[in-house]
């Protein structure tokens, strides 16, 4: 069970939103590269970067900062989402040292693009399913489709997707706990590993996620709880390793 710190980028700064609302942000740092260093020093094995401006614009906006983080920490596994709409964007990030690219909006609009990306970059493609009341949202969460997250996830079973990041928008940034029921339901419905996102805020959430690891939940993205200090990364990862039987 990997706990993955999130760095959300908006206008060049590290921010956290509430329920994905671009007008409800808290700025935690003007130096995202230094923030990445903070999580590296805390022992993280992986980092989740989101270009919030890019998610709305449909193309990379904060790519230069992401490139700097990837260059500064070449041994860190980095996954990036936000504005990933074509193969050239994926190629640019891969050449910059980014490990995994998260396809969200295009997974809804052009599911075949996910297959194309997996064929071009095998082992490096993640699908991001961001759901509000079970329905997948797109365009930086500004639009909610009629597509059910579980139904869309099943379409990618044979595509070669590395993982699915499942975000419960209603929990994101609200510090109300992870929606373990919905995440577990999705994980049980597919064979692709699921990374939970949205609401992880306490050691109790970590325990609940570890209890569901056998259902296919392989990790969890953590944001506001780390920034506000309600969750200590080293302590939480240590607990996850202990509960999941990982040796130090």
Curated annotation (Swiss-Prot):
Catalysed transformations (reactions): 1-(5-phospho-beta-D-ribosyl)-5-[(5-phospho-beta-D-ribosylamino)methylideneamino]imidazole-4-carboxamide = 5-[(5-phospho-1-deoxy-D-ribulos-1-ylimino)methylamino]-1-(5-phospho-beta-D-ribosyl)imidazole-4-carboxamide
One biological process term from GO is:
L-tryptophan biosynthetic process
Pfam families, A to Z? His_biosynth
Location comes to:
Cytoplasm
Q: Which GO terms describe its molecular function?
A: 1-(5-phosphoribosyl)-5-[(5-phosphoribosylamino)methylideneamino]imidazole-4-carboxamide isomerase activity
Q: What is this protein called?
A: 1-(5-phosphoribosyl)-5-[(5-phosphoribosylamino)methylideneamino] imidazole-4-carboxamide isomerase
Q: Which GO terms describe its cellular component?
A: cytoplasm
The protein's UniProt keywords, in alphabetical order, are: Amino-acid biosynthesis, Cytoplasm, Histidine biosynthesis, Isomerase
Query: What pathway does this protein act in?
Result: Amino-acid biosynthesis; L-histidine biosynthesis; L-histidine from 5-phospho-alpha-D-ribose 1-diphosphate: step 4/9
The yes or no answer to whether the keyword Isomerase is present is yes
Major enzyme class: isomerase
Source organism, top-level taxon:
Bacteria
What InterPro entries does the database record attribute to this sequence?
Aldolase_TIM, His_biosynth, HisA_bact_arch, Isoase_HisA-like, Isoase_HisA-like_bact, RibuloseP-bd_barrel
Q: What EC designation does it have?
A: 5.3.1.16
What is the name of the gene encoding this protein? hisA
Q: Which family does it belong to?
A: Belongs to the HisA/HisF family.
The active-site annotation reads: 8 (proton acceptor), 130 (proton donor)
Keyword Coiled coil listed? The answer is no
């Amino acid at each position: 069970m990997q706990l993955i710190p999130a760095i959300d980028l908006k206008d060049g700064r590290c921010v956290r939103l509430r329920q994905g609302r671009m007008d409800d942000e808290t700025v935690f740092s003007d130096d995202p590269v230094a923030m990445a260093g903070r999580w590296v020093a805390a022992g993280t094995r992986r980092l989740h970067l989101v270009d919030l401006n890019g998610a709305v614009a449909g193309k990379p906006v904060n790519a230069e900062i992401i490139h700097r983080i990837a260059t500064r920490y070449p041994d860190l596994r980095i996954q990036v989402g936000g504005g990933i709409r074509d193969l050239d964007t994926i190629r640019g990030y891969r050449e910059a040292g980014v490990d995994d690219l998260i396809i969200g909006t295009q997974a809804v609009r052009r599911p075949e693009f996910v297959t194309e990306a997996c064929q071009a970059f095998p082992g490096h493609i993640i699908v991001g399913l961001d759901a509000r009341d079970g329905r997948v949202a797109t365009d930086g969460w500004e639009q909610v489709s009629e597509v059910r997250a579980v139904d869309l996830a099943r379409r990618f079973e044979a595509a070669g997707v590395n993982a699915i990041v499942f975000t419960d928008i209603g929990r994101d940034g609200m510090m109300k706990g992870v929606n373990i029921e919905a995440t577990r339901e999705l994980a049980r419905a597919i064979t692709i590993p699921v990374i939970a996102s949205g609401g992880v805020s306490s050691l109790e959430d970590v325990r609940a996620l570890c209890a569901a690891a056998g259902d296919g939940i392989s990790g969890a993205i953590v944001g506001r709880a780390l920034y506000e200090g309600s969750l200590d990364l080293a302590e939480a990862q240590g607990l996850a390793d202990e509960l999941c039987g990982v040796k130090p």
